Structure formats: C-alpha cells, structure tokens
Amino acid sequence: MLAEKMGAITLHCMPVASTPTRRGRPPGSSAARASNGAGSEAATAIPAGATPAMAQWFVLKNQHPDALLFFRMGDFYELFFQDAENAAATLDIQLTKRGLHEGEPIPMCGVPVHAAEMYLSRLIRRGWRVAIVEQMENPKNRAGKGPIRRDVVRLVTPGTITEETLLDAGRPNLLLAITQSGNRLGAAWLDISTGLFETESLDESGLTALLGRLDPAEILCPSSLHLEMWDARRGPEQPVSDPANARARLAEAYDVSHINVFGSFTDAEAMAAMQALDYVRDAQMGALPRLGHPVPVGEAGRLAMDASTRASLEIDRARDGGTERTLLSAVQRTLTPAGGRMLAAWLGAPLTDRTVITARQDGWGWLLEQPTLSMRLRETLRGCPDMARALGRIALGRGTPRDLAAIRDGAHIAMEAAGLLEGILPSALAELHAALHLPPDLPEMLEAALADPVPARIEDGGVIASGFDGELDAERGLRDDSRKVIAALQTEYAQRYGVASLKIRHHAQLGYMIEVPAVAVETLRTVPELILRQGMANGARFTHPDLSELDRRITEAAERARQREMIVITALRQKVEAHAGSIAACAEALARLDVLQSAARLAESGTWCRPVMTDDQTLTIEAGRHPVVEAALEGGPTPFMPNDTDLSASRRVMLLTGPNMAGKSTYLRQNALIVILAQAGLPVPARAAHIGIVDRLFSRVGASDDLARGQSTFMVEMTETAAILHQAGPRSLVVVDEIGRGTSTLDGLAIAWAVLEALHSRIGARTIFATHFHELARLQGELPMLRPYTMKVQEWRGKVVFLHEVAEGAGGRSWGVHVAKLAGVPAATVRRAGQLLTALEERSVGLTDNATLPLFAASHGNETETEPAEGIHEAKPASLPPELIEALGQMEPDKLTPREALDLMYHFKSMLSSQAHNGDVEAESW
C-alpha cells in the first residue's frame, strides 16, 4: 500500500504543447458574462499614450484574458478595468480611479502584498482564477531606466493552490480531469499540495458517484458532460485527444519507457492524466510539482455509493454544507492535519477487500491492547506538522522557512514514533515502522541549519542559525559590526554637537539619518560637514559623510549576507527534494499511524467493537447505535436507545413500520453508517457486529425536490429508486424509507409493494424497508425472506411515548394525529383530525383483509416484474387462541394498575404473535 506512494518521482519538463484558449468560470459565468467578465480586455490593443506600466498590463492581460491580474506595483497588487470591478465586488473593497483610457477614468483597486493570501482565498472560493504578476527585478538595484520588468509567475486556480492559508488542513484539494474515449470515461485526479495522483476508468453513469466521492475543487472536462451540482467548479476546457501522444508524454514526464510500468491505463485514463499535468504545468508557468506517479485505482475494491447515498448519510458534509454533525466529526480523534485527511479518505472510500480491512483492524487493535504505549504515541503525534504539504511547496520553489522547519520537526517526531514501535508488530504497523526511518543526516542537517524559531518569510532574514555557515557568519559580522559603529557614532555626535536628544535612525528611502529636534536645527545648519536632507514638523534630518559611508558598507554587507543566506537555503531545499520520496512515505506513515491511534481511542470506551468481517451475506448487529445522534445526545438527559439488526440469510429483508418520530430514519442510517465504518477498517458503535462485505450501499432516506432540475420530491424519489433497482445486487445493502409517498395511497402502495418484491425476489439484496403501508406486512407469507418489525410505542391516557426500540412484529398505526399534536398543530384541528380518523377507521371495518383489496393480488416470488399478478389470495379468518379467550374472560379491568394493564397487553400480544407465526392468525403490533 505504502509502496505505491513511497516512490515519488521527479518530473522532467516536457515540450510545451500549444495551449488552447481558456475560458474562466467565475460564479454565474455564461456566454453573456464572458463578454463582460475577467477577460473583457483580451482583444484590447495597447492604447497610445499609455504609461510604461500600463502598457505592461495590457500585454500581460492579453496573455491571460480569463484571469484576474494581480499586478505588483511596490507593496500592492493592483487590479484595473473589469478585473478591478469584479474583484472589488467580490472582496468588498473600495473601487477607485487611476489615469484615463479612451478618455474615461480607469477603474482600479488593490490589496497589500503582505495580506494578499487572505484576498486570494476569498477570490478562489468564489471560483475566480488569478494571475500573479511580480516585479522581476529590485527597483533599488536595477540598472538603466524604463519600467520595472514584470511577468506572470503563476496562475492561482481552485485546483492548483498550495498556500497553507488557502487550503483546508483537513481535506484534500483535488484537481479532476475527465476525458472520453468511446463509451468510457477516464478520470485523473491529483493534489499538488501532497503529490497524490490517481486515475480511474468508468461509465458515464458512474460520474456523479465519482464526483461525490472525490468532491474536487476544480474539474476539467468536455462541455458535453453534465456535472449537475458540481458545474460551478468546472474549469477551462483543455482537451487531449491523442491517446498515443498522451502515453508518450506521460512516460517522458516520469522518465520511464512506458507508463504501463505503473499499471494498466485505458486510453481515456492516459488522456485525463496528461490533461491534468498540462493544466498544472501551465498554472505553474512551466514548472511541475513533485507528484507521485499516476496510480490506476479502478472501481473494484471499494464500496460503491452514489451521490444521493453520500448526501443522505452525511459522511463528511452535512446537508447545510458544514462539517459538524457528520460521521467524520463523530469519529474523528486524529491529532494531525494529514491524519484528518486520511480518515476522511477512508470513510469516503470504504473497502471491499477483507484482507486490507482486517489489517487495519489489527493495527488499531494492537494499539488498543497497549494503552501506555498508545498514550505516549498520542503525545508524540500531537503537534506534528503537515510534512506532505510543506514538501509540496518546497518542491514548487515556494517553500517558506516554516516549511523547512516542518520537515525538520516531522522527521524528529517520526524518529520518536519509530522508537516507540520497536518489537513484534502486526503487519500494518510493521509497514509503517519501516517508512518512519528517514536518512539520519537529513534531520540532523536541518536541526543545525535552521534558527529557532524560524521567521515566517525568507525576506525577513535570520533563517539560518549562527555557526552553520562560516561565510554567512562573516557577512553578518561585517553588517552587525557596522551597526555597532553606528551606535557609537550616535553618542559621539550628540556630544560633539551638544544635542543630547540627537538620534541616528534608518529610513527605507534615505538610509541612516541624524535626527534632531526643532530647537537644534539652526545650530546644526552651520556645521559644514552636516547636510540637511529633510525638514520635519518637529525637527530635521541631516546626513554626514562618515554616516553615508557606513550606510553604504552596512547595506552592502547586509545584501551579501542576504545573498549568502539564500544560497544556503537553496542548498537545504535541494537536500530536502533529494529525499522527497522518503519524506512523502514518512508523512503518509505518520498520517496512517494517527488514524489507527484515533480508531483505538474510539474503541477505548468499550462501547465500540471490532466487527467480524466475512465474505458471506450475513449482516447482524447487536445493540447498534447511530454515532452522530449518540454524540449529539451525549451529556443530555436522554441516552441513545441501541437496537439489534438481523439480516441473516433466512431473513435478509426487514420491513420496518411505525409512527413518525419513532426513530425509523435514524435506525436506517445507523445500519448504513455501521457498514461504512466496518469496511473502512474502523470500530463500530455496537456491542457486537458480523458484517458480510457489502459491495454497493444504497440509502434513500429523506427526499426533497430538486428545483434546479425541475424535479418534484416524488420524481427525485423515483429516480433514486430506479437507480437502486438497476444497480443493486445480492451483496448490496439497501436502506429505503417511505417508497411511494408523494402520490395517491393506492399508487404509492402499489409502487412500494413492487419495489419490495423486486428487492426480495429478483435482486436478493439485504434490505431494510421502512414504510407506513402496514398492509405490506401481510406479504410475509408470500416472501419467505421478509420479516416485519416495528418501532415500539406506548400510549397512556391519550398520550404517546416513542420508545425508539425496534421489535419484531407488524405495526398497525402511524400515530400521525399524535405527532401533529406534538408539533403544535392547533388543538381544534387535532380534534377534528381525530374525529375524521375514527370515522374513516369505522368505515374501513371489514375491508382489512386481502380479499377486499384488489391491489393485493400478490405476484409470486418466481414471477418477473413484467408479468401481471394473477389470482387473489384470500386471508384466512382470524381465530383467537383459547388461552387468550380464557384470560380475557378472567380479567377485571377496574382493578388493574396502568403498569399491570400494559404488561397484560404485551402478554396478549405475545400469545397472538406465537399463533400468528403458526399461520393461524395475524397479530397487530401494539
């Protein structure tokens, strides 16, 4: 597993292919927007009379018409024309004017260079692409006249960002490229911040599931593909249409004879991978980041979940788009950013390979059995830096001193963790242990080289520690000695000129100056060697020939020290890059170790268990719980009610009835989430669990309309149901809620019945089918694998108590009027509803057997869906057990306490259920 990521390969620059015209996709972009958007000046010629700087702007804007141009001018990035108007509106900053263009003032806005990342973050999140234009020479040191040379140094797009402040520490930042070859799609996704690079071949029908699993920041794909809710993330179309050329260029990029050394790639996958690399290279102005080789992952080996299932289960995103009250938030005990990302990846792509699942379980299980070691390991991992992303920035030439420090600190943490894991280990931990060992000279060199603490920016100086480089120390000594001379001169000048308050200060534009108060100005004007340079409201500034010479010496020494420090820093970066593969593998090992300790921490409470994983179709859970709801209830007065689930071979379809608010939806979701956790290799919230590997998971719980696509709630429900019936198989798990609602009662009942039959008899999937159509419980005789269950309810003196407990048996009421009362429906309306319900129930007396419902001409299990049902199955007249008749005759209702009455009712129910199972009577659940 780790071997796939260990061998990070240095990419070689490849011939630059012709770059097609790009079309940026800011929010709400359209053809109309394009003519008035970021690129509206693309065809504008350089106007006569333009200043040299503005002439540069026009040239660069014509090269990057669809990006906002961050044009460096001194300490600001300036934006002009439509760029300025778009940026000012997005950033809520002031729009000003500068100069004229064709007789009109030029719109302008700007952001400070030191705060640019904050503004970039807001623009990128709104979907803009930004071209960064830097000054390519120092204004102070350049020779000759004319404008400062400027050029675009990079394009910042949602899928190609690397800055720590722009990235979400807990989520990958993926660029996804999709191409088409014949009837197959090829997808390639990469994260330049960590080096991840993977591909997959899929049908177009699997596209939304892929998008839901990856949640990419930016998508490159043909305009003919419909991305639905991800369309706002669509990047410029940049097609690659020659698979042979794509394979050859990929092989050249990785310096191999053929890309098949990395695995088997379809033509579409190869073209998608090359498209992604081209886009990244263009965004980095020809440079390529350190990327692992492309890994074809394929669809096999992962639990398949479509987009609606992911949304329904709120795995890592809640319905409101946030991350709270999700499965990830409920189980996360990771201590590092990389560990958080890996845990999210495990939950987003659970496995179907029992061997790999078991290896993960063995890893956290071993840590669980070593509590003292685990505690020390957590202390070691706490505060571990994000080595992978630091390495990515260093490889791109944008590494900061703190990125070098992150590699240093991460290496020390890895060494300490490796020391803790010495000895006999399970295979999962043994593999990690091997990857934690970096070449010892690397952390030693970084420890000796870097100052502590390191500054945030290289420009601030002081990155390299004293004593590491003799030449740098010498230049710093000259600079610092000259500064000591300045301090001595201040004392000498104050005494010589009789001005006790005289100060020598450095100014960015003037250099070192003598500053005196106003009362001393006239006296110093008469001193021949002093030259007045600047008057001030409260004094004046003078210079002196000796001071000017010292200023020159200090400036030159400081510049030599700066240049030498840059040489040393560059050497450190190169040393880090030389070990990039080992560092990347170490970073992944630390992340995996963090996930395993998180799982062990979760299991420490004793209320989470290690599920038994098998390749059969069993799915049994003892005292299972919904992890998110349980976490929300923690500390409150009401504990979560655990429930069992038994979908073993002889009872693999569970028909669940019961009232609203009784917990049906929670129960459905909790079983799906337990399967996800189990197949991610993690503990599950249950006393015990036996999970036969699920290949596809479908959750249709809680539907809503899709106004953007013009679909009603019922249409959305039917579309999702159709997907289940087409894609589910014998190894699938299907949890569905209220199939058939949103239409007439008979239509809904007919649809629910037909779907239930298909899942039971044709597909054979493990199924939990929640419904308010209580009549479906009568299908138990027709569908041998079906078992009815209901949510238990207690009623006393007109009040209903929902017990949130699943019990075997069929429910007879939905308690909708009681729920309406609890919801605050006016009392008069509730009373009227109760009267109408009573009347309707009385009218329906005698119409409750199958013979009186034409709909219940049940098809037999061996009939196909297209065959009409034949025959009406008569229900046998109900006969009460003699024991029950005798007990009723002896009962004295007026002498019973409420508790005795309730116990007696449950006893009667048990007697009825016992006879119902023998086929003599149908029992109604109380």
Swiss-Prot record:
Source organism (scientific name): Granulibacter bethesdensis (strain ATCC BAA-1260 / CGDNIH1)
Any one Pfam family match given in the protein's UniProt record, by short name: MutS_III
A biological process from GO: mismatch repair
Protein's UniProt name: DNA mismatch repair protein MutS
Low complexity compositional bias, start-end: 26-40
GO molecular function: ATP binding; ATP-dependent DNA damage sensor activity; damaged DNA binding; mismatched DNA binding
High-level lineage: Bacteria, Pseudomonadati, Pseudomonadota, Alphaproteobacteria, Acetobacterales
Region annotated Disordered, chain positions: 16-40
DNA repair is among the record's keywords: yes
SMART domains: MUTSac (SM00534), MUTSd (SM00533)
Binding residues annotated for ATP, in chain numbering: G658, P659, N660, M661, A662, G663, K664, S665
UniProt family annotation: Belongs to the DNA mismatch repair MutS family.
GO cellular component: cytosol
Keywords: ATP-binding, DNA damage, DNA repair, DNA-binding, Nucleotide-binding
Claim: Chaperone is one of the keywords in the record: no
The protein's role, per its UniProt record: This protein is involved in the repair of mismatches in DNA. It is possible that it carries out the mismatch recognition step. This protein has a weak ATPase activity.
